């Protein structure tokens, strides 16, 4: 009687604009694997162009999960992501599949790979309104005082995660950093990183593609539907387009500012992922990147029996 293969997980991570989505689709098609998103903005509906969400045509090529999970006005925490992702991975594994977790949100990936557990504290709308009234610079400075580790990890302009960390502190009395615990999964995991020494050129190219694909129109529609004070509109790319729509950025300055801020974000992602010695890196510019990834996966499957 043939022995059943063990469950496993493949992770494809790396900085933004490195080409993870296209490589993931190619890998998934070869393996018959589903793709699970590990991107903190893809969980929201209607945020499509500026998040580089896989297009409907791309999603038809391979099953995609963990996208379009909630309304942009909802608070969606890392714990919420974990609650969705963990049972989904198990369900897919039980069907004999080898899921492919793809994205650049390091904390989402760590939540799965390391089993990082998060405090289950419900959103506090009144507290959030009070904090938002203080303004993001003051909120982040406050976070640096009450939880310096989280303050260093969370970008000064990341309003969503800043508010969440402060919310946890003021509701529980404990720092988010102290409440996080790790319970790694029992199944083997292969982490593949994708990076490029031409990342800046890739970022410039993708920014232009977003703008010609209707990014400004997408943001205008989001402002009309949800209001310009929607926290998600203060995230990378959307913040710059809002500034353009409000007249504080010119048409020529808009792509420059998006590229500049995206480069800074990519640098943070690199620092996060490069700190993990278990990640095996592939050059995004290599012509054999797909073959290289498939070779890593094949050796992983043979050694782990997955």
From Swiss-Prot:
Enzyme Commission number(s) of this protein: 2.5.1.75
> What is the residue range of the signal peptide feature?
none
Binding site residues for ATP: 14-21
Q: Which residues form a coiled coil?
A: none
**Residue numbers marked as site, Interaction with substrate tRNA:** 105
GO BP term, example: tRNA modification
Which domain of life does the protein's organism represent? Answer: Bacteria
* Cofactor(s) required, per the database record: Mg(2+)
Region (Interaction with substrate tRNA) residue spans: 39-42
Going by the record, the broad EC class of this enzyme is: transferase
Residue positions annotated to bind substrate are 16-21
Q: What's its catalytic activity?
A: adenosine(37) in tRNA + dimethylallyl diphosphate = N(6)-dimethylallyladenosine(37) in tRNA + diphosphate
Keywords, sorted A to Z: ATP-binding, Magnesium, Nucleotide-binding, Transferase, tRNA processing
Q: Which GO terms describe its molecular function?
A: ATP binding; tRNA dimethylallyltransferase activity
Protein family: Belongs to the IPP transferase family.
Under the subunit heading, UniProt states: Monomer.
Annotated function? Catalyzes the transfer of a dimethylallyl group onto the adenine at position 37 in tRNAs that read codons beginning with uridine, leading to the formation of N6-(dimethylallyl)adenosine (i(6)A).
Write down what this protein is called: tRNA dimethylallyltransferase
Report the source organism: Synechococcus sp. (strain ATCC 27144 / PCC 6301 / SAUG 1402/1) (Anacystis nidulans)
Q: Which gene encodes it?
A: miaA
């Amino acid at each position: 009687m043939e022995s059943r293969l063990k469950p496993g997980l493949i992770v494809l991570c790396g900085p933004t604009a490195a080409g993870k989505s296209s490589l993931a689709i190619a890998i998934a098609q070869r393996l018959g694997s589903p793709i699970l998103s590990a991107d903190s903005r893809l969980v929201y509906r209607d945020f499509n162009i500026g998040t580089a969400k896989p297009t409907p045509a791309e999603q038809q090529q391979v099953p995609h999960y963990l996208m379009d999970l909630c309304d942009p006005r909802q608070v969606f925490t890392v714990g919420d992501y974990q609650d969705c992702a963990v049972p989904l991975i198990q369900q897919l594994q039980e069907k004999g599949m080898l899921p492919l977790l793809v994205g650049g949100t390091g904390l989402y990936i760590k939540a799965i790979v390391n089993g990082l557990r998060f405090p289950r504290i419900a959103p506090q709308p009144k507290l959030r309104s009070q904090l938002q009234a203080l303004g993001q610079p003051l909120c982040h400075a406050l976070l640096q005082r009450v939880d310096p580790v989280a303050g260093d990890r969370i970008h000064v302009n990341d309003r969503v995660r800043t508010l969440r960390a402060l919310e946890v502190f003021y509701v529980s009395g404990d720092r988010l950093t102290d409440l996080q615990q790790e319970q790694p999964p029992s199944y083997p995991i292969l982490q593949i990183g994708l990076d490029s020494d031409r990342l800046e050129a890739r970022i410039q190219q993708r920014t232009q593609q977003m703008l010609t694909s209707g990014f400004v129109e997408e943001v205008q529609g989001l402002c009309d539907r949800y209001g310009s004070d929607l926290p998600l509109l203060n995230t990378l790319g959307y913040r710059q387009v809002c500034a353009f729509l409000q007249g504080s950025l010119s048409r020529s300055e808009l792509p420059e500012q998006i590229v500049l801020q995206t480069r800074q974000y990519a640098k943070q992602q690199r620092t996060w992922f490069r700190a993990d010695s278990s990640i095996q890196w592939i050059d995004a510019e290599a012509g054999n990147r797909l073959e290289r990834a498939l070779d890593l996966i094949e050796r992983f499957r043979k050694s782990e029996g997955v």
